[in-house]
Amino acid sequence: MTFEIKHRDAMGRIGILNINGKKIETPTIMPVIHPNPKKQIVSMDLINKLADVIITNSYITYKTKHLREIAEEKGIHKLIGFDKVIVTDSGSFQLGVYGDVEVEPMEIIEFQERIGVDVGTILDIPTPPDVDRERAEKELEETLKRAKASIELKEERGFKLLLNGTVQGSTYLDLRQKSAKEMAKLGFDIYPIGAVVPLMEQYRYRDVAEIIINSKMYLPTNKPVHLFGCGHPMFFALAVALGCDLFDSAAYALYAKDDRYLTERGTLHLEEIKDLKAFPCSCPVCSSYTPKELASLNKKERERLLAEHNLYVTFEEINRIKQAIRDGSLWELVEERVRCHPKLLEAYRVVRKYIDYIEKFDPVTKKSAFFYTGIESMFRPEVLRHKKRLKRLRYEKVYITTVSSSIEKPYHEHLNVVETDVDILIKDPVFGFIPYYIDTVYPLSQHEIPELFDYEKEINKRFVDEFIDWLKKKIGEDNILDIMTYNYYINYFSANKKINADALRIRKMLQYQYGFDIIDDELMNKIKVVRSKTTGRLRQVLDENGEILFSVRSNDNLLIPSEKGAKLLWKKIPFPKYRVVVNKEAEEFAREGRNVFAKFVIDCDEELRPYEEVLVVNEDDELLAYGTTILNGIELREFNYGLAVKVRGGLKINK
């Protein structure tokens, strides 16, 4: 099995999961298929059309004589009528519902291997929510014991099937953490998070969100995570943003039995909407029937068609989430979805407790602008990261001001400011401060914020006050200028000094982007800039010989180094910061400007964020290449497959 990340936003990722030569693009949904074809509501033709992976129950197959005989003779794929990836549950669901199963833990592993399952599951114990701690601990220990035995059996017997190692622990977050840590040590292929269905049935989405995060924090980043039993599309966006890659759904069929109609915003009963002229959906079912026509059909036909609609809308939401990841707008989609139900909003609000961890996985730049959709946006990773990176700038004199909300961004293009060596900090209702000299950098000019209520402003005011206190300690209170002192200073400055404002802007932008003073006082007098002939905006940074050091990327205004710029960064930034270290095998390829793959990475700056500009070096810190990291500092050390750094250029050895 291999797994690689192609696109990402929040903790969500579009990945390619390769199982036995069959490719699955994640995130995705696994429709639950009954192993008895006669009991399957939706035709396998439609399942084959929509799904790359399904999940079925090996325990039912095992306990049903004629199904077991067919599966053992012809294989599970022939029994189901599905040639792509088949995942099986082991009977844990039945164990949770009925309290007992008539199969031994190792026996069901052997059976899953025997019938040709692609991904099997250990017979874990799904501890329900809110049980007493003693029971939760005891059942977790038994699950871990079975997990270890299952891995040992697989290795000893040379089984081909991949294995799910399910994270348990009831509603005790420390037990979920323990379970994740211990499962991770055993080296499972996929990590489901189990026993959350009762919580979702009770709309306890906050508990589910906390369980996901507390499990994810201790699971390996290079393996997919499956949220067992999550089948309602309105929860997918949040779950993906928290790092879930796989879902399974029996909801499409179960809801249809009760005449329930799934939407991405909730569930409707057919009886409630039968008087509508048309369905709020354009799937083949909803395009062919009116609500009244569908309601008038016999029970069996109505159930089949409703199940088909439910399946279509489920996959539609998955596709919508993937597009949001590609666009860099997943947080906006999440904030739209969580307003579908108060309990979902409650779940989203608990995420702020873990935002320091989530920020590590959130890309530093995105295609889409930051849209403020409610007070929850105040705590998003983009805001947290900016507030931290404000302290990267080198301040000497500071003037703090406000501007009218009618002033367009970037501010420096629309304000009549005498440019001096004073750092002008413009108060912002969400981002705290926007420094005048870096106001083009993402997301400082790429955001939209409505007029805020006073209680929203109060949250930001706390940060503003804390940052001013930090400034006073850093540069001294006398160097935070009031308006009279500032006006006097700029008049004096204009008469007595000259400043290369473009060079100062580049210097500040590099400080913000890298955290180090790349352009020192000597270089300040040597660098030149090239501006766009159409927009007048900065496009290139040149050295004294007219050679390009950096290009200013138009969509986010990050500074992208040339070979000479990369050498400057390497000289100014101490090891291991902004480094990705590769082994000797990859040195020649990196120097030739070829992409760096994860299996060649042996070390890195652990603080790297996705899509940052990085330096590729060898173990002796010799600069080999430069480019954009796809993975963060944690993932670079854990992934062993797929693209790690998209290289822009290599440094060939002069012979």
Curated annotation (Swiss-Prot):
UniProt domain PUA: residue ranges: 577-652
Keyword match Glycoprotein: no
pH dependence (UniProt free text): Optimum pH is 5.5.
Gene Ontology BP annotations: tRNA wobble guanine modification
Domain of life: Archaea
Keywords: Glycosyltransferase, Metal-binding, Transferase, tRNA processing, Zinc
Descriptive protein name: tRNA-guanine(15) transglycosylase
Taxonomic lineage of the native organism: Archaea, Methanobacteriati, Methanobacteriota, Methanomada group, Methanococci
Gene label: tgtA
